[in-house]
Amino acid sequence: FSFERIDLHLDENKKQSIVQNCKDRNYTSFGKYNVERVETIDGFKFFFDDDTWLMIRASGTEPVLRTYSESSSQEKCFDILEDTRKTLLD
């Protein structure tokens, strides 16, 4: 398995808006990755149907969202993180 992280630097209002959307369970997919279930311990961990996951954690000290992914390959991890970036910011 591969594990990757990308930090999204954005303004505080956008960060809080995304966190609220996570709390409200407004994200049912990130690009082609459909959310099967969500855990809310230490952030928002979205599990997909193919043994992969994505975690979104808001920094408590700066306007940053940290996104983490685990998958069977590094390429797929980065694909998940890119689809996540597009979903959250576009």
Per-segment meaning from a language model:
Residues 1-90:
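Phosphate-binding and adjacent anionic-ligand microenvironments
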